């Protein structure tokens, strides 16, 4: 129910009275007639394919199929021989056809205008009988099996008529000694056509019996009695000693608690219990149960139409039986058949509301069960979760995530086919501004052609538009972060592995949603607050949340590992070589560039040991030992010397000053050290910038 009187709209799902259903469904035409009741089970005319009058698609009830065109296919102001429109001078009748009685309004009215079916007998709502918990048995205090037998006319109950004692309810009259005499008195009523009157007065079954029982309930008295009984059972529970008696009392207490909660809700919501029995069945608007004409004879329609047709046909048959019951020739056997027709009507309404819980679910020609009203609104594909709560959002997409090791922390790889759809309006505007396309149609043609220059322009367009990546469930703020998109040719989203901790994601098939912020405020918020490289610490503990993953740690280990060789292989042997430190197995390099050139030329491997000349101005060597003792000290004839340690060597001149330092390392360690140096250098430049005000 949408409350249009208040500023904020709300959706409320509750039980309504038959009067409210009639108020929603009935419409007063300009000629004073009331329409809204659906009596014809037909949908479309088989020859003209037009809606049948008073049928499930009637234009008098639900509005015109075409905007401003009546069933006669005439627009306002046109004349047709044989009839005339209502006087156009009268404003109230200007949009009404006098002949077909169809209002000439917008066809969108067929999306929300309802109808109703007046049931020949009351029908109990299946949701309140067969579902758990079952509310109708809870209220009337009967077993669920007994209530089901009563609803489906397998059980009769005696009830008072007009608050007066009946024959079967006189206390003390039906005793064992006078039972034969009573059978003789009642037999003429049961075996003749007087049974109809006898049944209406003395017996009740079906939805009518449930309705009478619920109508006679006083909720406040029932609440008081239930509470008093619960207190009495609470005292008896402490007295009883056997476990069997305690279990019996506990079961009754649980039943009373359920009843008290439900009765309190009914009183608070001002709902009458008898509203759980239907007298008027609402008919959904036609646009919510569409029908499509695919050919001359082939028609595709919603399953709800088939279920509505079954209800209308059985309701019509029951009405005919009621009209014939006053006939003396109407035999008792046919009256039994009328009771059977009540059960058929109950089953038809059950199938419409919840086909899965009905006795025999209705099936189509391919033995597939029809989708009932419960199936339409329930589940992930239902009306609520698919259209109201979690409907698909514009400018959004979804795909599988894979690792992107070459991406920066604030970047993500966006598939080209997804990006060209998400940024199509921005791309069209850019093409028109550049003069590449004269209009929107030409721009769309270029985009559909996938010209090579389109991808370059698209990448420029994406520079000013960050995207939001979200992985469900979004449990904290790190579940949705902003990234700068980079075009990739694959169909998967590429993601930096360090940000997966915040998303609680891995690369085993997880999917993530992409959203494009549109407004200036959303783009600014994405850049200032939601970018991944600005969300590095957990707000709860202050610990880093963007940390290297196991794959990255394993890669760093492989990168910095070296071959375990003894240090004696790199000692100075003057008898074997003229070179001081290097040999064929351990080459010597003077700087980083020489190492990288040799690695590209495949003269050295990633983990091969080598000697690298270290910059003396950078200071000493950091070791794991505070004061490392040299393994060997070599003195030259010219006064120079060199000290050989475990991982480095130091050359000194005649004055004892350090002239050269050589460190024992690998290509992988040099690569790792260079990246660390670049990171510290960029960070120091950022701190030295006058626009930066760091807070520590």
Swiss-Prot record:
Its EC number is 2.7.7.6. The keyword Zinc applies. Its main location: plastid. Keywords: Chloroplast, DNA-directed RNA polymerase, Magnesium, Metal-binding, Nucleotidyltransferase, Plastid, Transcription, Transferase, Zinc. Mg(2+) binds at residues 506, 508, 510. It comes from the Eukaryota. It catalyses: RNA(n) + a ribonucleoside 5'-triphosphate = RNA(n+1) + diphosphate. DNA-dependent RNA polymerase catalyzes the transcription of DNA into RNA using the four ribonucleoside triphosphates as substrates. This is DNA-directed RNA polymerase subunit beta'. It comes from Welwitschia mirabilis (Tree tumbo). The lineage of its organism: Eukaryota, Viridiplantae, Streptophyta, Embryophyta, Tracheophyta.
